Amino acid sequence: KNGLRKVAEAHPDWIAGDFAIIGEPTSCGIEGGCNGTIRFDVVTHGIAAHSARAWMGHNAIHDAAEILRRLNEHTDATVSVDGLVYREGLNATLISGGKGTNVIPDECRVHVNYRFAPDKSLAEAKALMMGADCGAELGNGEHQATGGVFEGFGIEMKDESPSARPGMDSELTRSLAALAKAR
């Protein structure tokens, strides 16, 4: 959303290099690498009915309680990569469902954001959340989670970005860190 992708696609030579410094104002310190992210909807389905005859339907929002239970019981990992510590996070960030105040909802979506440490690839992160063979990819609709935290639920991918290893094994990185620490 900041336009960097357009620059990278139009002028890859502008960003080619052996080393990069990205300004990050938080604490003005050096942070190596970054967590990756996958964002996806976990979907429940019900049967719409008038709320005066709720027994004729099935409430998809009520079924979302199981999704929230799994999120609540999940323990976020703390992972060390190249001597740096990364904290993972698995959180619901949005919930949507229902079409009216007197209609039993036939769908509910819990939007989930998983921030994963640089010891994992995108594929490994997805496998932990939805199973290795779920098939959910950006733009290909809803797929059934075959394993992972959300096994049995519908999954629709919304966004993904790989993690970045810290590169502390690079002489350039070590030199910069030593220089910054000395000042």
Predicted features along the sequence, with ranges:
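Metal-dependent amide/peptide-bond hydrolase catalytic core
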Residues: 25, 32-33, 39-183
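Acidic/histidine-rich catalytic neighborhood of metal-dependent amide-processing enzymes
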Residues: 1-39
